[in-house]
Amino acid sequence: MRVKGGTVTRARRKRIMKLAKGYRGSKHRLFKTAKDQVMKSYAYAFRDRKVNKRKFRELWIARINAAARMNDISYSKLMHGLKVANIDINRKMLADLAVNDADAFKALVDEAKKALN
């Protein structure tokens, strides 16, 4: 007698089809294409978790640079000045200060300038 898989196969296919919900065209209708797309989606997710970190660092640096130049100093000089002044603050916090608390950022810039002179 031939075994058809029954509940196990249905459960496996249902799981894949549930993951493929919202995909376009046959990618959410047909099991084979849905399975391929779900696998591809996992690959994209894995890759983009790494890319995400790079993109945010880029964004923080752009924000810090813009705010620094408003205070007459370049990004690289600001970062070097902070290092010389032993001010250990990461780019995420620095960018947040630049956007939300301009006075505190200016105080840090002044400390960096003082350390460079």
From Swiss-Prot:
Organism name: Limosilactobacillus reuteri (strain DSM 20016) (Lactobacillus reuteri)
This protein's name: Large ribosomal subunit protein bL20
Domain of life: Bacteria
Gene Ontology CC terms, in alphabetical order: ribonucleoprotein complex; ribosome
GO terms of biological process kind: ribosomal large subunit assembly; translation
Gene: rplT
SUPFAM superfamilies membership: Ribosomal protein L20
Alphabetized UniProt keyword annotations: Ribonucleoprotein, Ribosomal protein, RNA-binding, rRNA-binding
Stated family: Belongs to the bacterial ribosomal protein bL20 family.
Physiological role: Binds directly to 23S ribosomal RNA and is necessary for the in vitro assembly process of the 50S ribosomal subunit. It is not involved in the protein synthesizing functions of that subunit.
GO molecular function: rRNA binding; structural constituent of ribosome
Statement: the UniProt record of this protein carries the keyword rRNA-binding: yes
